[in-house]
Amino acid sequence: MINKTAKNTKRLRRAERVRYKLRQTSERPRLVFNKTNRYLTAQIIDDAKGVTLVYATTLEKDFPKHENSKKSKSAATELGKVVADKAKKAGVSQVVLDRSGMVYHGRIAAFADSAREGGLEF
């Protein structure tokens, strides 16, 4: 049986290690993707200034409706498009993807691919 606490602790350690390396590159803001049990969130953070430039979540009222849920792969694809659109309006074109220690697969890959199609470079 997998110890859930140990699994989450390892993920958090990976996330901190990667975030430390990403913060060293201050010329590009971080695109942070996070998934919860119910929703998906994404934000673009400028670490040099400590400011969130763009924020989007599947919880927003104007987010497109999905037949499955607000945490599905199709919702992640739509979230990537929304974040890319908001980033264009904010004048951000180049970012660094922060996966929060999660594997680049499934919802994260769908989100990243749609954000790239929307015009973000990473």
From Swiss-Prot:
Disulphide bridges in this chain?
Answer: none
CDD domains (UniProt xref): Ribosomal_L18_L5e
List GO BP terms, alphabetically.
Answer: translation
- The superkingdom listed in its UniProt entry is Bacteria
Stored PANTHER family: 39S RIBOSOMAL PROTEIN L18, MITOCHONDRIAL, LARGE RIBOSOMAL SUBUNIT PROTEIN UL18M
What does the protein in this record do? This is one of the proteins that bind and probably mediate the attachment of the 5S RNA into the large ribosomal subunit, where it forms part of the central protuberance.
Name of the protein described by the UniProt record: Large ribosomal subunit protein uL18
Specify the species. Answer: Leptospira biflexa serovar Patoc (strain Patoc 1 / ATCC 23582 / Paris)
Q: Which gene encodes it?
A: rplR
